[in-house]
């Protein structure tokens, strides 16, 4: 199975406890490593980081924004993230998309609708309901 993991707002392979790196980063990193024992896993972030490939696990940074940028300010980069994702990968080759955090979920839902690829969404927090977010983007 070919699995696409989207972690738009933070790199799961950057230092935990710094910037937006925390529990979600650990979760995405660990689940991706374990899934890669039997599947091809591609993890993509918009945060600037060093990309790598390790057997069945590939990590791709689209290098859109600095790690120090506040998560509330990353929303404006969603369309650029989706565009670069479509330019960088043949998305039709993925069997499933797992989106982490609500920002990644917005992109995964669009791709899923366009290419009829099933997607899983894990919220990891209720941050979307905090002040400062553009809730008009969310359509269930």
Task: Label the model's feature ranges.
Residues 53-71:
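Conserved nucleotide-sugar phosphate-binding/catalytic loop shared by glycosyltransferases and other
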Residues 14-18, 70-72, 131-136:
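Short acidic, glycine/proline-rich loop/turn micro-motifs
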Residues 89-104, 108, 118-120:
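Short N-terminal targeting/anchoring amphipathic segment
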Residues 138-140:
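Conserved small/polar residues in nucleotide/adenosyl-binding loops
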Residues 3-4, 112-132:
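Active-site proximal beta-strand in glycosyltransferases
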């Amino acid at each position: 199975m070919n699995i696409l993991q989207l972690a738009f707002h933070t790199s799961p392979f950057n230092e935990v406890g710094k910037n937006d790196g925390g529990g979600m980063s650990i979760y995405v990193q660990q689940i991706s490593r374990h899934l890669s024992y039997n599947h091809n896993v591609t993890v993509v972030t918009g945060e600037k980081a060093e990309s790598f490939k390790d057997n069945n696990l590939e990590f791709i940074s689209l290098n859109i924004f600095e790690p120090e940028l506040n998560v509330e300010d990353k929303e404006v980069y969603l369309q650029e993230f989706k565009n670069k994702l479509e330019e960088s990968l043949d998305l039709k080759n993925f069997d499933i998309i797992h989106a982490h955090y609500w920002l990644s979920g917005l992109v995964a839902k669009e791709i899923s609708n366009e290419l009829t690829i099933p997607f899983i969404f894990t919220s990891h927090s209720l941050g979307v309901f905090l002040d400062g977010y553009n809730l008009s983007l969310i359509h269930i």
